[in-house]
Amino acid sequence: MAWASRLGLLLALLLPVVGASTPGTVVRLNKAALSYVSEIGKAPLQRALQVTVPHFLDWSGEALQPTRIRILNVHVPRLHLKFIAGFGVRLLAAANFTFKVFRAPEPLELTLPVELLADTRVTQSSIRTPVVSISACSLFSGHANEFDGSNSTSHALLVLVQKHIKAVLSNKLCLSISNLVQGVNVHLGTLIGLNPVGPESQIRYSMVSVPTVTSDYISLEVNAVLFLLGKPIILPTDATPFVLPRHVGTEGSMATVGLSQQLFDSALLLLQKAGALNLDITGQLRSDDNLLNTSALGRLIPEVARQFPEPMPVVLKVRLGATPVAMLHTNNATLRLQPFVEVLATASNSAFQSLFSLDVVVNLRLQLSVSKVKLQGTTSVLGDVQLTVASSNVGFIDTDQVRTLMGTVFEKPLLDHLNALLAMGIALPGVVNLHYVAPEIFVYEGYVVISSGLFYQS
C-alpha cells in the first residue's frame, strides 16, 4: 500500500544501509534525526491507524441489533521516538480517534484518546540489510466522550460501545504497526541494489554487523564495494578496521557519516582501472594562441624545429599507469597524480611521430562537497608540476623551459577533465527520496566526516 511504503521510507531514515566485511564507512543517526522522523511521520501514522471497526452487536433488546461504527478521523498530535541503548528505538504516540456510531434515533460521534507504545529491535538479515521487528507493543485508551451530550443513547449502551471499540483497537492497532514494519523490511531489502558511478561502474552498500545503539545515536558499520564491468574493486586487506570517534563533526546534526581512506582509495583505483583519467590534449592549429604545435616546441627544442620546418599539430597523450593517491590530513585533503605524458607530432603522412615522453607528478588540492545524495569534488594544482624526461627522440630537453609550456597547455585540460569526473560524484549511504541538506565536511587524519541534516522528498 502507498501509505505503508511512505511510512517505511520515513522509518528507513533510521537505517541507512551499506557494507561487506571490513567497514569502510560508518553511518551514525543522531537524536535530531529521530526528531525529524517524528515530525514528518505523523501523517503516515495517522493513515495507518485508520482501521476497520466491525459492527457492534447489541443483545440487550428482544432482538439482536447490529450497530455500524466507522472511524471518521485519526489525529496524531504527538509522535516521539527515542533510542534505547543496546536495544533499538521506542515509539511513543498519542492519537485521538473520532468514531461515528450509526444508532437510532440519530448517529452519535465519539472521541477516544489512545496512547501507543512500541519497541523495535534492529538486526541484520542474511543478505546484509537491516531487519526491523516489533518486540513489544501496547496501547492505553482513555474515556470516550460524546460530541453531542443531548443524544438520547442510553449510558449503558455507550459503555458497551466504548468497550467494543477499545477491544477492537487493542487487537488491530499493534497489528497495523507490525504490518508497517514488515513493509519497511521489504523496502529495506531493495537497498542492496547498485548505484551508478559511471557508464560502466557502480557502488553497492551493505551492512557489516548488527547496529550499535546508544542513548544518543544508532551507528551502522557499513562497507562500500565499487564495481567495474561487474567485477569488484579489491584493495589489499587493511588489518585496522575503521572506527569513527564519538565526538566528531557538528554537534546536533541529524546524520554523521564517516568515510575512511579505504573508500577514497577504491574510488581512485576504479577511475584508474576504467581508464577514465586518461586523456588526449590537442589544440587548434590555426588558433593564434595555440601552443600545441611544432613551432611552439621548436622555440624550446631546436631538433623539433629542424625536423618540422612547417607547423604541425602536437598531441599530448596522458595516461595514468599508477593509481592516484588521496592523502587525508587534518583540514587538508590532497591528490597526487603521476601521469605518463607522451608528446607526439603529426608527420607529413598524417602518422603520429613520438617526440619525447615525460614522467609527471601533479599535486592537487581536493575540495569536497555534497549535493543531495552524492559526494563530489573539485581540484586545483598545488605547487609546481614536476617533470622528468622519460625518453626523447629530439635530443636534449631543458625541463625548466618545457615546464612553462606544460603549465599552459597541460594543467587546465587536466583539471577540466578531472573535475568533470569528480563532479559526477559517488552515491552516499541513503534511501530513496532522502537527501542530505546543509552538509558540513570535516577532514581528519585518514578519514572524512560529513555532518548533515536530512530532507525526505515525498
UniProtKB/Swiss-Prot annotation:
Phosphothreonine modification, residue list: 52
Record PTM Phosphoserine, positions in chain: 60
Major site of localization recorded for this protein: secreted
Keyword Disulfide bond attached: yes
UniProt xrefs under Gene3D superfamilies: Bactericidal permeability-increasing protein, domain 1 (3.15.10.10), Bactericidal permeability-increasing protein, domain 2 (3.15.20.10)
One Pfam family named in its UniProt record: LBP_BPI_CETP_C
InterPro entries membership: Bactericidal_perm-incr_a/b_dom (IPR017943), BPI/LBP (IPR030675), BPI_fold-BPI/LBP (IPR051660), Lipid-bd_serum_glycop_C (IPR001124), Lipid-bd_serum_glycop_N (IPR017942)
SUPFAM superfamilies: Bactericidal permeability-increasing protein, BPI (SSF55394)
Signal peptide feature range: 1-20
Subcellular location: Secreted
Keyword Lipoprotein in record: no
Superkingdom of this protein's organism: Eukaryota
Any one GO cellular component localisation term in the record: endoplasmic reticulum lumen
SMART domains in alphabetical order: BPI2
GO molecular function terms listed in the Swiss-Prot or TrEMBL record: lipid binding
Glycan attachment sites: 96, 151, 293, 332
Tissue spec: Highly expressed in tonsils, especially in hypertrophic tonsils. Detected at very low levels in fetal liver.
Keywords of this entry: Disulfide bond, Glycoprotein, Phosphoprotein, Secreted, Signal
Cysteines joined through disulfide linkages: 137-174
Family, as annotated: Belongs to the BPI/LBP/Plunc superfamily. BPI/LBP family.
PANTHER family: BPI FOLD-CONTAINING FAMILY B MEMBER 2, BPI FOLD-CONTAINING FAMILY B MEMBER 4-RELATED
Protein name, per record: BPI fold-containing family B member 2
Native species: Homo sapiens (Human)
